[in-house]
From Swiss-Prot:
GO MF: ATP binding; ATP hydrolysis activity; ATPase-coupled transmembrane transporter activity
SMART domains on file: AAA
Function of the protein: Probably part of an ABC transporter complex. Responsible for energy coupling to the transport system.
Cellular component, GO annotation: ATP-binding cassette (ABC) transporter complex
Binding annotation for ATP: 35-42
Membership in a protein family: Belongs to the ABC transporter superfamily.
Membrane-protein topology: Peripheral membrane protein
Domain ABC transporter: 2-235
E.C. no: 7.-.-.-
PANTHER family: ENERGY-COUPLING FACTOR TRANSPORTER ATP-BINDING PROTEIN ECFA1 (PTHR43553:SF24), HEAVY METAL TRANSPORTER (PTHR43553)
SUPFAM superfamilies: P-loop containing nucleoside triphosphate hydrolases (SSF52540)
Protein's name according to its UniProt entry: Putative ABC transporter ATP-binding protein MM_1037
Annotated organism of origin: Methanosarcina mazei (strain ATCC BAA-159 / DSM 3647 / Goe1 / Go1 / JCM 11833 / OCM 88)
Length: 274
C-alpha cells in the first residue's frame, strides 16, 4: 500500500533525521514504530501523507508519488494523520463543525458531509459531544475528536504519531481501544510511540535509532529483544517478568503478557497445576 524507497531527510541544521529508509507498509496491517526521542519515527510518519517530502528517495502511496505537490490531495485522501496534541487540528467552534471541515474542503454535497460527520461521531462514540467546543473536552476526548475528524475523510490508512503521550493512562487506553477497533474493521494502522507497552496488538514492529531502522519483526520477538535497553527503550514490564520466570522454568505464554489480569490468571493456573 505504501512504499518508501531509499528515503533520506535532514533537519535544517544538517542533522540526518532519516537515512536510506526502505519500507513497505501492507494494506490492512497494524505497524508499530518505536524509538527514543530523536530517533526519526515522527519524521517518518510525516512522510507518509506528504507533510514532509524526502530530500532523497521516494514515498509511493498506492502508486502515487507523495513527493509530487500536485498529488498531495489524492495522497491525503488515502492517508490520514493524528498528532500528539489534538488542539493543533481543531478548526470548528463545535465538534460537529470541526468534523465537517475536511469534507467541506473536498467540496462534497451537504448531505454527504452530514452522513460522514454522523458516521464518525457514532464510530468514535462522540454523539453526545456534538455541540460542545472541542477545546472544552478532556485530553482523551479531544484526541478522539481529532481521530473522528480524520475519519470523515475516509482514509484507508491512519497514522498515529505519539497520540497517547500527553494523556493519562485511562484516556490513553480509550484511544488505543478505538484504534484497535478501526484496525479490526480493515483500516491500515501506523502507530508511533516510545512506549513499548502499547504495541502488543501490532502485527509488526520497527525499531528506529538515529534515523535508521535497526530492528524489525513480530511483537513477540521485538519486544523481548535484549538490545532494546541499549537503544534507550524500556521493554514491557510483563515481558521482562516473564523472561525472569522462564529462568526458573515457569513458562508464561506470549498471549498472556498483554495485560496484568491475563498474566495473573496464567500464573495462578500454572501454580495450581503443580
Amino acid at each position: 500500500m505504501i512504499r518508501l524507497e531509499n528515503v533520506s531527510y535532514c533537519y535544517p541544521d544538517g542533522t540526518p533525521a532519516l537515512t536510506n529508509i526502505n519500507l513497505t507498509i501492507r494494506k490492512g496491517e497494524y505497524l508499530g514504530i518505536i524509538g527514543r526521542n530523536g530517533s526519526g519515527k515522527s519524521t517518518l510518519a510525516l512522510h507518509l501523507n506528504g507533510l514532509r517530502r524526502p530530500q532523497k528517495g521516494k514515498v509511493i502511496v498506492k502508486g502515487i508519488d507523495a513527493g509530487d505537490f500536485s498529488k498531495l490531495q489524492e495522497v491525503r485522501k488515502i492517508v490520514g494523520i493524528v498528532f500528539q496534541n489534538p488542539e493543533t487540528q481543531f478548526i470548528g467552534r463545535t465538534v460537529e463543525e470541526d468534523l465537517a471541515f475536511g469534507p467541506e474542503n473536498l467540496c462534497l454535497p451537504p448531505t454527504e458531509i452530514r452522513k460522514r460527520v454522523d458516521r464518525a461521531l457514532a464510530e468514535i462514540k462522540l454523539e453526545k459531544y456534538r455541540h460542545h467546543s472541542p477545546k472544552s473536552l478532556s485530553g482523551g476526548q479531544g484526541q478522539c475528536v481529532a481521530l473522528a475528524g480524520v475519519l470523515t475523510m475516509e482514509p484507508e490508512c491512519l497514522v498515529f504519531d505519539e497520540v497517547t503521550s500527553m494523556l493519562d493512562p485511562d484516556s490513553g487506553e480509550t484511544v488505543l481501544r478505538r484504534i484497535k477497533k478501526l484496525h479490526e474493521k480493515g483500516k491500515t494502522i501506523v502507530y508511533t510511540t516510545h512506549n513499548l507497552e502499547e504495541l502488543h496488538v501490532a502485527d509488526r514492529i520497527l525499531v528506529m535509532d538515529r534515523g535508521r531502522i535497526v530492528l524489525e519483526g513480530e511483537p513477540e520477538n521485538v519486544l523481548s529483544d535484549p538490545s532494546l535497553k541499549d537503544l534507550g527503550l524500556t521493554p514491557p514490564s510483563l515481558i521482562e517478568l516473564a523472561e525472569q520466570l522462564k529462568k526458573h522454568e515457569i513458562e508464561i505464554s506470549w498471549e498472556n503478557t498483554s495485560s496484568p489480569s491475563s498474566f495473573a490468571e496464567e500464573l495462578c493456573r500454572l501454580f495450581l497445576k503443580t
